[in-house]
């Protein structure tokens, strides 16, 4: 989505037309979803509404780690094109998301097999290390481009590939971690907690990234995001991993 939008914008397409494409995509998605047929399930008696109906309480530590991780991701999806222009990278920034998608595709080759073998926390830790490195490199591009703009441009897209591999490794592993902490009747709650943590973090990233860039610059916003990934990695190692191994149900 970001790649296609940036290509249209760089090609001189107006914002109104770009939003029309986005609206058309939403309508196609809604139409496709409405055609899905599922077997009828009779209503079941629900227990009184409580917090654990919506949030997996045992998944809160992992949710906090994921939220911290998704803040810089939200900054990237919304501001990386403006950051590239700010520091002087003038190539098609839509390719950043192309390489990011390639990295995610590469990660699927091996990450799923490792998760199936039970190496969930190890896979997430490996992805965290890659993401930490990639965000610090992204923040340093503002200095590297003064040394060699060609090398910095190559590194810029290399960062996207590395970031895609890191996040691609972690996405399915985090989802499995949440599900493994939940009893069978709360698997939906586990997935909801996973997605809520991710979406809230992206929203915070959009707000904080824009605010920091307004008062300082985008490289400072990404440096802040890189520091958050370090906090997330340390918290995952010290808190989430032992909590998961103590409370996992499968």
Where are these regions (language model features)?
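Helix-to-loop junctions at the C-terminal end of transmembrane segments
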Residues: 9, 107-120, 213
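C-terminal transmembrane helical hairpin of 12-TM major facilitator-type secondary transporters
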Residues: 118-174
């Amino acid at each position: 989505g970001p790649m296609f939008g940036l290509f249209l914008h760089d090609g001189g397409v107006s914002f109104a037309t770009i939003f029309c494409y986005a609206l058309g995509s939403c309508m196609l998605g809604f139409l496709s979803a409405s055609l899905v047929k599922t077997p009828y399930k009779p209503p079941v008696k629900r227990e009184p509404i409580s917090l654990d109906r919506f949030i997996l309480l045992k998944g809160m530590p992992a949710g906090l780690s994921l939220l911290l991780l998704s803040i810089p991701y939200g900054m990237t999806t919304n501001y990386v094109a403006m950051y590239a222009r700010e520091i002087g990278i003038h190539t098609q920034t839509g390719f950043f998301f192309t390489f990011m998608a390639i990295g995610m595709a590469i990660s699927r080759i091996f990450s799923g097999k490792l998760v199936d073998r039970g190496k969930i926390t190890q896979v997430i830790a490996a992805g965290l290390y890659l993401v930490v490195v990639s965000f610090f490199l992204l923040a340093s591009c503002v200095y590297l481009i003064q040394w060699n703009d060609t090398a910095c441009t190559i590194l810029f897209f290399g960062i996207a590939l590395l970031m895609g591999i890191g996040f691609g490794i972690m996405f399915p592993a985090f989802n499995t971690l949440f599900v493994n902490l939940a009893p069978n009747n709360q698997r939906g709650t586990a997935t909801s907690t996973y997605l809520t943590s991710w979406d809230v973090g992206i929203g915070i990233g959009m707000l904080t990234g824009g605010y920091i860039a307004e008062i300082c610059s985008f490289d400072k916003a990404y440096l802040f995001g890189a520091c958050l990934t370090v906090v997330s990695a340390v918290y995952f190692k010290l808190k989430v991993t032992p909590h998961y191994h103590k409370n996992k149900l499968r």
